Amino acid sequence: MSKSSIYGLTYEKLKDWLIEHGEKRFRAEQVWNWLYKKRINSFDEMNNVNQSAIQLLKDNFVLHTMGEEIRQESQDGTIKFLFKLEDGNLIETVLMRFHYGLSVCVTTQVGCNIGCTFCASGLLRKSRDLSSGEVVEQIMNVQKHLDERGEKDRVSHIVVMGIGEPFDNYNNLMDFLYTVNDDRGLNIGARHITVSTSGLAHKIYEFADDPIQVNLAISLHAPNDELRTKIMKINRAFPIDKLMKSVDYYLQKKNRRITYEYIMLDDVNDHKKEAIELANLIKNHRHLAYVNLIPYNTVDEHIDYRRSKSENIQAFYETLTELGINCGVRWENGADIDAACGQLRSKQIKKSKAV
């Protein structure tokens, strides 16, 4: 049986585990500091921890559960990493550079079962969930890459928008969030972390009840059930009415802004009537709503879909703003590399099968 990732333990779980195995309470703080502040690559680097404790950790945990398979760097500084896991599966992680800091997009599952008809991630069905340690390790790998390049900046923002549905891996997601948010370690502010869901309403209720104050984004992509079901199979299980009731509960509990993600598909969901429907759908909580219009990244396997024309994106944006909806257009990072979610992984798997 393979050893677990040390990054899979929250601070409290690490402390409890060490005490259970005969170590003093302070040992957790020492180890945590080495993991997240000094970012060690070997347990042997912990020079203020006794050898018996180091051996205990080495016998039960590992620091590395994945290796870098491919790295693509864009002219705009975006870096896409393809990591190979211990079981041979591939996942993607993306570093994006913004004026406000460095943001990392992490993956939570190997493959995806949500079934969005326009997305590269769903071309390969979900084979398993990632452990919380595997999600944390993505952040650590990116930060260590920056350290090795001599970059002094640290990862300041996280978006959980990579391959998979985060709320379908809920417990591991929450351990990940508490680990990266912990002020004794990476200390990434909750307001700098965004979790995106395709709309698992029952998990939105659960997320609303959790005290952590991270941001929520909903991949909406259509303002009515007929169209949303056509492009997102998840809408059969969680139609818009059920989804919006969970949103109401979330807003009541958190009083925090929700971002609605809306992919712009040419002649599919980009007409004025959809803009009006969308505005009407969220008008009752528009003071806590923001719409992110996302120009579509073309995927070879989905030839039926094209990016909306620039003038249609602009018209959609103007209609929403005229109706009092806060919105913006999110132009992609890494346009010259395989930066659309799932593209690089899909290409590499196809290439491997062709050999």
From Swiss-Prot:
Stated role: Specifically methylates position 2 of adenine 2503 in 23S rRNA and position 2 of adenine 37 in tRNAs.
NCBIfam families, per the entry: rRNA_mod_RlmN
Name recorded for this polypeptide: Probable dual-specificity RNA methyltransferase RlmN
Keyword Transport: no
Radical SAM core domain span: 98-330
Superkingdom, natural source: Bacteria
Entry keyword set: 4Fe-4S, Cytoplasm, Disulfide bond, Iron, Iron-sulfur, Metal-binding, Methyltransferase, rRNA processing, S-adenosyl-L-methionine, Transferase, tRNA processing
Gene Ontology process terms (BP): rRNA base methylation; tRNA methylation
Name of the gene encoding the protein in the UniProt record: rlmN
Other notes: Reaction proceeds by a ping-pong mechanism involving intermediate methylation of a conserved cysteine residue.
Active site: E92, C341
Binding residues for S-adenosyl-L-methionine: G164, E165, S196, S219, L220, H221, N297
Residue pairs linked by disulfide bridges in the UniProt entry: C105-C341
EC number: 2.1.1.192
MF-aspect GO terms: 4 iron, 4 sulfur cluster binding; metal ion binding; rRNA (adenine(2503)-C2-)-methyltransferase activity; rRNA binding; tRNA (adenine(37)-C2)-methyltransferase activity; tRNA binding
Compartment(s): Cytoplasm
Cofactor notes: Binds 1 [4Fe-4S] cluster. The cluster is coordinated with 3 cysteines and an exchangeable S-adenosyl-L-methionine.
Positions annotated to bind [4Fe-4S] cluster: C112, C116, C119
InterPro entries: Aldolase_TIM, Methyltransferase_A, RlmN_N, RNA_MTrfase_RlmN, rRNA_lsu_MTrfase_RlmN/Cfr, rSAM
GO cellular component term of the entry, any: cytoplasm
Catalytic activity: adenosine(2503) in 23S rRNA + 2 reduced [2Fe-2S]-[ferredoxin] + 2 S-adenosyl-L-methionine = 2-methyladenosine(2503) in 23S rRNA + 5'-deoxyadenosine + L-methionine + 2 oxidized [2Fe-2S]-[ferredoxin] + S-adenosyl-L-homocysteine; adenosine(37) in tRNA + 2 reduced [2Fe-2S]-[ferredoxin] + 2 S-adenosyl-L-methionine = 2-methyladenosine(37) in tRNA + 5'-deoxyadenosine + L-methionine + 2 oxidized [2Fe-2S]-[ferredoxin] + S-adenosyl-L-homocysteine
